[in-house]
Amino acid sequence: MGKLLIVDDDLSILRVLKMRLESEGYQVEVASEIEAAKYLAAINEYELAILDLKLPDGNGIDLMKSIHEVDPGLPVIILTAYGTIESAVEAMKAGAYIYLKKPFDYRELLFQVKNGIEMANLRWPSRN
């Protein structure tokens, strides 16, 4: 399976997602701050990123834009508890693969992780 980056300021969400996705065979790295996430994205190759929309030091959309400067083909799932139609549209226009509201169904998230990686591999075969 692939390597994932998860960024969320809620440490319980980070722990649960890391544990569940690792049990599915993924390698998972986590960050709770934007600068740490940017650093990880600069030194690692990920197959997908899961980013919280609202972070204490910024937002997931701006983080996604920064990550896409390093890896334009990286699929990004945006998660949020504070979602609006406007923020969903903004995220998708900025390059998000999908936008999910918290609380989310883990099965849906897992499906979107698998699907996002497959779609990215089809669009950018050099990512394989």
Protein language model features and the residues they cover:
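Active-site beta3 strand of CheY-like receiver
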Residues: 44-50, 55, 77
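Active-site residues of response regulator receiver
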Residues: 8, 52, 80
